[in-house]
Amino acid sequence: FKIADETVKLMQKMTACGELDHLTAERVWLETQKGLNTPSPHIYFEVLRKVGALAVLFPEVEALFGKPQPEKYHPEIDSGVHTLMVLAQAKKLAKQAENPTALLFSSLCHDLGKGLTQEDILPHHYGHEVKGIQPTRNLANRLKVPSEVKDFAILVTEYHTHCHKIAELRPETV
């Protein structure tokens, strides 16, 4: 999959001229839903970033790029790169999901709290799960994401790190 250079330049020009500001939330969500349900959903967001549209349409996601994470847990280091890697992995599980779109959107949103991390504590992101609830809610509300998808994304954002300790929990806790 490759976008012609002329098309990329046109998309960059459209972004720079403010044409994206005239898109309705419903249209952005419709196209995003299509992008999420392609064989490689991360490419949709990579292209948006390449043409400058990610910062306009998904500023919460754009804020993740350039935010380092501890290499011990995330060898890719960059939080934005990590998010797109998670999205690519989630796609492999999406066929088994009751709501594939909810799974994929949640994967995109799961670390939005890292975009709010203060520079002086990087590469750590203490409390990013709870800090990520509001950006996830804001993004979902702005795009008029269906409630079922939004609610699942908020839960995933808040609780996604709990799975790392599941082996330590009592069965009744789980």
Report the location of each language-model feature.
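Glycine- and charge-enriched loop/helix tracts that form the active or gating conduit
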Residues: F1-L104, L108, L112-G127, K131-K150, ...
